[in-house]
Design a protein with these regions (language model features):
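Eukaryotic, polar/proline-rich low-complexity intrinsically disordered regions
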Residues: 2-7, 11, 47, 71, ...
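Positively charged, polyanion-binding regions of nucleic-acid-associated proteins
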Residues: 6-35
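A short acidic, leucine-rich amphipathic alpha-helix
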Residues: 33-40, 79
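Intrinsically disordered, low-complexity regulatory/linker segments
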Residues: 39, 52, 101-104
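Short amphipathic alpha-helical interaction segments
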Residues: 63-81, 87-90
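Short, amphipathic alpha-helical interaction segments positioned at domain boundaries
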Residues: 81, 94-139
Length: 139
């Protein structure tokens, strides 16, 4: 018998704090990408899957991740803001090792200024693989 998935909006403050702790432990010890968010939410039997994309405001065709629901995106955004994080371009290996890559053309440049400058010119969706790092982190 399949167990019911828990809605993210039904998380208690303690459950959300535990999730954020797991996100942060993953980030500090191994690096954190969108696939890690999915894996942790899956382990907690949360309803996170959907049809939405995470994109940057600079260009809707600059896709960071896809197939999430609105509640999952809100949870991730809350974690990112509350922990003072930013998205940093990475390679696809980080995602492949964790179980999924997007079936989109990949932006492989790590030059953030160039990526942001060209984002609005993308005519079709392109995937920008990212990891989360501290705003102060310069690695």
């Amino acid at each position: 018998m399949a167990s019911e998935l828990k809605k993210i909006t039904d998380l208690s403050d303690e459950e959300k704090a535990q999730l954020f702790k797991e996100f942060e432990d993953q980030r500090v010890n191994y690096g954190l990408c969108f696939m890690d968010f999915e894996n942790i939410m899956y382990e907690h039997k949360l309803d996170y899957q959907g049809k939405l994309r995470v994109s940057l405001p600079l260009g809707e065709n600059l896709v960071l991740w896809s197939l999430l629901n609105e509640d999952a995106i809100r949870l991730i955004n809350e974690y990112v803001v509350s922990h003072g994080l930013r998205y940093k371009p990475t390679d696809t290996d980080m995602y492949a090792e964790r179980g999924r890559v997007l079936d989109l053309p990949v932006i492989s440049s790590k030059d953030e200024a160039k990526i942001m400058k060209n984002a609005k010119d993308l005519k079709k969706p392109h995937w920008l693989p990212v990891e989360l790092v501290s705003i102060d982190e310069n690695k």
